[in-house]
Amino acid sequence: LKRYCADFETTTDPNDCRVWLWCTINIDDLSERHYGTDIASFFAWLPTKGLTEIYFHNLKFDGQFLLWYLLHETDFAYDEKGGEHSFHTLIGDSGIFYMIEMVLAKKHKNVDKIKFLDSYKKLPFTVKKIAKDFGIEESKGEIDYTKKRPLGYEPDANEMEYVTNDVLIVCKALRQQFEQDLTKMTISSDGLNFAKGQIGKKRWQALFPGAGCIDR
């Protein structure tokens, strides 16, 4: 299992809406960092072996760019059954994004896949607040979102630091959660799992025989 945090910086022009900078950092090895200046290079970077989880802080936003690229620039087919070389989503009726999953390859019980997840479901706060509340030394910076960034634009040092800190802050907070065995998809699922652990599996089933909870 490889786990990363990621962030897209995008243009604000509705007639030219695209990724102009992205960053990924390995949650378990913060020295592993990757950058690019368009979404094509992001997809080219994606790991192809084993299970990879990639957290975006607000998947509903970044996920729209992922889905657009999958639908328009790749030959991946949508398949809720998770067939080889396909993708599927977990999106609530109200439009809440929980997961986008790409299945790259299958061989017997071995599956190579990528799960795009929403760190906001585990850390429902702004990046600035996360840094403060978790005692993280990096702080959220500022950039000019309205600045013109044409195709081929090269990010400056401040913009690189901005995207790095945004990703690094969430990485460090998630790592603290993972070290406490808070590894579920959402904060509520983490709470449920903790309660089950405190009560015990047998007693939980006796107390709530018809709960039928989805353990995510």
List PLM regions with ranges.
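RNase H-like nuclease fold core
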Residues: P14-R33
